[in-house]
Amino acid sequence: MEELICREGTVHSVIFQNAENGYTVLRLLTEEGEVVTVVGCIPCVAPGEHLTVTGTWEVHPQHGEQLKAQELERTLPEEEEDIFAYLSSGVCKGVGPTTARRIVDRFGLETLDILEAEPERLQEIRGITAKKAMEIGELFRQHMGLRRLMEFLSRYQLPPVLAIRLRQQYGDGAIRVVEKNPYLLSDDVCGVDFSVTDTMALSMGFAEDCTERLEAALTFELTYNENNGHVFLPKDKLLAATCQLLSCGVEQVEAALDALAEHHAVVIQRIANVEAVYLRRLWEAETSACARLLALLEMDADESRFADRTVAEIEKEQGITYAPLQRQAVELAAKVGVILLTGGPGTGKTTTVRGIVALFQKMGLNIVLAAPTGRAAKRMSELTGMEAQTVHRLLGMTWNEAAHQVTFQKTEKEPLEAEAVIVDEMSMVDVSLFSALLRALRPGTRLVLVGDADQLPSVGAGNVFSDLIRSKKIETVFLREVFRQAEQSAIIRNAHRVNLGESPDLKGNQGDFFFLCRRDAQRAVATVLELCKTRLPDNMHIPAEQIQVLTPTRKGPCGTINLNRLLQEALNPRTPGKREILWGERVFRVGDRIMQTRNDYDVVWQKDDGTVGTGMFNGDVGRIAEIDAGGEWLALDFDGRKAPYSVEMLSEIDLAYAQTVHKAQGSEYRCVVLAAMPSAPSLMVRGVLYTALTRARELLVIVGDDAAIRSMAANDRQQKRYSGLKWRLCHAGDASE
């Protein structure tokens, strides 16, 4: 066992501090005059503080001997010069060395107490107004509150960055709130894993059978499964999973579930032969979506008189002749209120959508086009010649901080002006977003839902597009014919082969489709790097920024985590003068390709034409345009939407040189490099391979194991998603809560 070393002294300087995890490197000046380098989790520390550090010596290959902190005690500075160093270090924005010196000279050892409790006394200093005094006091009070909260969290090995979210949600009383019920940390605000909050709560004296623990575990299981695509869980599965999580009896858990239902936190309802348990918001979304869709289906929308003559006019104007199924889809748009249009690549979906748009225009309808992601909306605009926007922006999605939930400007109270709405990439739309869209439609609005039913389902809960098709309650057109021009593309031919359960043709060079066999993961990684850095830019004249690496998985040598690190080094290496920020284990650098990894409804963005909007959403891709000299702010550019991000917001983004196939859904790239190596069984399925192939527009290069690729094509196993939408549509009027 290593000998524990204790050093006591004053923080001389902070060399490095990671805002996300609190990891700090500092210089400690001991009472004996020794300067010691201390490393460890010491959040919110600043020069002038007094530390007592207990730990072990370790030798860093570059920085030499360091004291790795295992335990520490910290107190605020008590000497005037230490108080000056602390105050002038930046702990209180707006107070620099000059102002700090004047404050300390006036108040001496009482400085910190006065700043926090009596900031109005700062007016005693010449040049500090009443307004400035209160501003300084408020900033210092916020700093001290955040510092105490970070220290509290660090005692339970919780990341300091969590303090920011807690303070935003609960204000000055955050510590009291968490002490009263630490299980709140596992809610949607904080997202701490239940096992962590459970350990924390039990150490604080909460009983194993307490109500807070049982209800939190049930909610955690429902939320965890929502994140895996389920709208509800069968009651027996929920009880079994929760009992296993808590190691307790089913009677206690069932009683807690009944209490949650009584308080309307969950809804229990029989769906077919299953007793389904819903989080209330998901139950409301699903039932509302069903009711509103049925109302649209019941309306009299038959405008057949437009169909035959108008479709012929459109063919003549656009210089085309529709295939029978394309004509059927366009004509149906005039006859019924809701239609579904599905088909794979090269089957003419875009041509058909253009025809439907032209039909609606001739009918004099006000048309709105939308898609789930910014990239999909941009592609829809390019293909139709009309403006398309994200569903989120169309509905005016915002975050209501007081209610802690998503809200929409457009609802039944203030519906969309549109008389016809066309939504593309419907396989990406989850039940909550679909419900919100339907709420915003006026009675009589025509709705056209377009997508590829064979692609992966939405990231969010539900299997909406598939449920709608399988219900057979809505007029559906399946485009199956691959047109001659599209057949010339090996990408499209191979995508359809995969969709039929056949292996793609893995001959080396097929024009726009290449396969490079690499059965060793490290060789595959090296090939991916070489393709992106030199071979494709030099030989195919495709710039690196137009190449997207896709992979089924996040983990492993060919996962996004490892590939992003290596691709960043290859494509955007560290150079003198190029600014970067270390955030956890990741480095973010000017010029990096990045992705938004969770919805942020408050981000304000602006385009060059002056258009201003709010909201960045999970899956949005952009780049880092700028990092400020102080490393506190970044300027991000998401396809022309430019937004400032504070360093605390870096937890919302990740590198995007490599993306998972699921994240890439709805996007299309000039060139795709697919790293296809064996991975988790749930990812080695046909839907993942098919979706990956259909992301490439001009060139697809598969690097990987031929056996793994054939296995994926043959494996049609689809992960079951618990959803009641299809059943509700088929049994309208039968469901009862």
What are the language-model segments listed below?
Residues 453-615, 625, 732:
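Conserved helicase motor core of P-loop NTPases
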Residues 270-345, 351, 357:
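Pre-Walker A segment
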